[in-house]
Amino acid sequence: MTSTTNTMCGSYYRNYNGGHGYGCCGYGGLGCGYGGCGYGCCGYGGLGFGYGGLDCGYGGLGCGYGSFCGCGYRGLDCGYGCGYGYVSHSFCGCGYRCGSGYGSSFGYYY
């Protein structure tokens, strides 16, 4: 994926080599997943939120503790106390204004 627009996951083309996952923040679609974000965070087989639904992780919209995607603990934004995510505001914590979180060595912070 070479698109530089912000998708539901905040996917940027830099994520492909920036440590955010295979195929620019998603193995099978727009979601964060399989190669770097971790399939425990944003899924790996659809629009990319959760194990098979439209939510990050397995707690709710933006959750996913232990993720590499920096998904927020609660809500549709990134947050502290969740994987590499610290402070940012995007749907899934990948790309726009997030990267993998503030002060993280696993990606970028936009």
From Swiss-Prot:
Domain of life of the native organism: Eukaryota
Any one GO CC term of the record: intermediate filament
Keyword Glycosyltransferase recorded: no
Key words of the record: Keratin, Repeat
Record GO biological process: keratinization
TM region positions: none
Secretion signal, residue range per the UniProt entry: none
InterPro entries assigned to the protein according to its UniProt record, in alphabetical order: KAP6 (IPR040313)
Family affiliation: Belongs to the KRTAP type 6 family.
Subunit structure: Interacts with hair keratins.
Function: In the hair cortex, hair keratin intermediate filaments are embedded in an interfilamentous matrix, consisting of hair keratin-associated proteins (KRTAP), which are essential for the formation of a rigid and resistant hair shaft through their extensive disulfide bond cross-linking with abundant cysteine residues of hair keratins. The matrix proteins include the high-sulfur and high-glycine-tyrosine keratins.
Protein name: Keratin-associated protein 6-3
Organism: Homo sapiens (Human)
